[in-house]
Amino acid sequence: MRLWLIRHGETQANIDGLYSGHAPTPLTARGIEQAQNLHTLLHGVSFDLVLCSELERAQHTARLVLSDRQLPVQIIPELNEMFFGDWEMRHHRDLMQEDAENYSAWCNDWQHAIPTNGEGFQAFSQRVERFIARLSEFQHYQNILVVSHQGVLSLLIARLIGMPAEAMWHFRVDQGCWSAIDINQKFATLRVLNSRAIGVENA
């Protein structure tokens, strides 16, 4: 089984450096172009299944990547980005002034401190682990497209290849690229990270 991983296209929140977990943040013109280019790059891959975050920026990306393919998109809430609570759509400079104590605590211990009224890393990582546990449901598929977010995909890669959850920051998943992980019964192999080449099955 191969997972083809795609991060949603660029949003204005990405440009502005805002925390955007669950807040609605539509794709920019560049984000749309990134997804359309991925449609071209991955046109030769025969996807059996599409799994996507329930957030619109990811779903829009999935629709553009699939384009004219008649493939249903299965919405998976576990693929949603981390929820930043009161910090949604806010810049770190503002949080340093307006929620200084909690934001400082989170910066110093992001694994245990929790964004104000948001989702802590422990809950977030457990949610991604639930998705990993579900992968056995899809083992009869060959090529699965997964459309999600930076945090989720970084954590997913780390955990699938046997690294601890806190190692997720070793993997930056860029927009406008595709990555691939092969999974067999014993282990997973990161085959490709952040490629802008034409995708080829079984390569």
Curated annotation (Swiss-Prot):
InterPro entries: His_Pase_superF_clade-1, His_PPase_superfam, PG/BPGM_mutase_AS, PGM_Phosphatase, Ribazole_CobC. The active site is at H8, E81. Its EC number is 3.1.3.73. It catalyses: adenosylcob(III)alamin 5'-phosphate + H2O = adenosylcob(III)alamin + phosphate; alpha-ribazole 5'-phosphate + H2O = alpha-ribazole + phosphate. GO terms for cellular component: cytoplasm. One of its GO terms (molecular function) is phosphatase activity. It comes from the Bacteria. Keywords: Cobalamin biosynthesis, Hydrolase. It is an enzyme of class 3 (hydrolase). Transmembrane segments: none annotated. Catalyzes the conversion of adenosylcobalamin 5'-phosphate to adenosylcobalamin (vitamin B12); involved in the assembly of the nucleotide loop of cobalamin. Also catalyzes the hydrolysis of the phospho group from alpha-ribazole 5'-phosphate to form alpha-ribazole. This is Adenosylcobalamin/alpha-ribazole phosphatase. It comes from Escherichia coli (strain K12). The gene is cobC.
